[in-house]
């Protein structure tokens, strides 16, 4: 399930000993699991902090508690304490399932489109403060999207749609034949590039 290296165990044990609280352990949880924003959270946990449904992993000198709801997302996780090329030491957590898994080949076109939008397209648009939401996926394979944030009203939305989003969706999701914009860009209040400024 979860692998915690000897170096990481030694690191945690020293920190816990410094705290001097009887029964203190380390709690591991997944934050925003199943999304591109997913992250792992480690924190000290005194016995009174525990809810009682955590999974307990006995380590050398302490217990690692995994929040019950986070267990599926942490399956296969590796916790290590590594020396970087700069000589600094750092705790690392690799949790391959924390952001979710791509839909199976048998998944519907809608599931596949939503996955690609949330895990590939929106993280790229976020650099401009933008995002897209899937409004509809027709049986014919036409995807209808609604732009938001910095993309709502942006003068480059058409280029983003055709050269970025449509190309990505058609290349990654079998059956997608076109991507259309359902956004009323005239109502955008903070576009990344105002429509009248686009070349």
Curated annotation (Swiss-Prot):
Alphabetized InterPro entries for the sequence: Fe/S_biogenesis_protein_NfuA, FSCA_dom_sf, HesB-like_dom_sf, NIF_FeS_clus_asmbl_NifU_C
Residues involved in [4Fe-4S] cluster binding: 151, 154
Name this protein carries in UniProt: Fe/S biogenesis protein NfuA
Keyword 4Fe-4S: yes
Family of the protein in this entry: Belongs to the NfuA family.
Cofactor binding description: Binds 1 [4Fe-4S] cluster per subunit. The cluster is presumably bound at the interface of two monomers.
Single Gene Ontology BP annotation: protein maturation
Transmembrane segments: none
Cofactor dependence: [4Fe-4S] cluster
GO molecular function: 4 iron, 4 sulfur cluster binding; iron ion binding
Subunit structure: Homodimer.
This protein's UniProt keywords: 4Fe-4S, Iron, Iron-sulfur, Metal-binding
Top-rank taxon, per record: Bacteria
Free-text function comment from the UniProt entry: Involved in iron-sulfur cluster biogenesis. Binds a 4Fe-4S cluster, can transfer this cluster to apoproteins, and thereby intervenes in the maturation of Fe/S proteins. Could also act as a scaffold/chaperone for damaged Fe/S proteins.
């Amino acid at each position: 399930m979860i692998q915690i290296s000897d170096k990481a165990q030694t690191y945690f044990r020293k920190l816990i000993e410094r705290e001097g609280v009887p029964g203190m352990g380390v709690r591991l949880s997944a934050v925003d699991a199943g999304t591109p924003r997913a992250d792992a959270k480690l924190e000290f946990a005194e016995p009174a902090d525990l809810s009682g449904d955590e999974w307990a992993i006995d380590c050398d000198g302490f217990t690692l508690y995994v929040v019950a709801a986070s267990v599926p997302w942490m399956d296969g996780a590796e916790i290590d304490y590594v020396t970087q090329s700069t000589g600094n030491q750092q705790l690392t957590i690799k949790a391959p399932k924390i952001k979710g898994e791509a839909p199976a080949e048998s998944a519907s076109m809608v599931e596949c489109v939503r996955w690609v939008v949330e895990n590939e397209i929106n993280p790229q648009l976020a650099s401009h403060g933008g995002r897209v939401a899937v409004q509809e996926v027709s049986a014919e394979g036409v995807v209808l999207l609604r732009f938001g944030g910095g993309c709502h009203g942006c003068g480059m939305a058409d280029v983003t749609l055709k050269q970025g989003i449509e190309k990505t969706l058609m290349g990654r999701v079998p059956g997608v034949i076109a991507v259309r914009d359902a956004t009323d860009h005239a109502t955008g209040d903070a576009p990344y590039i105002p429509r009248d400024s686009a070349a």
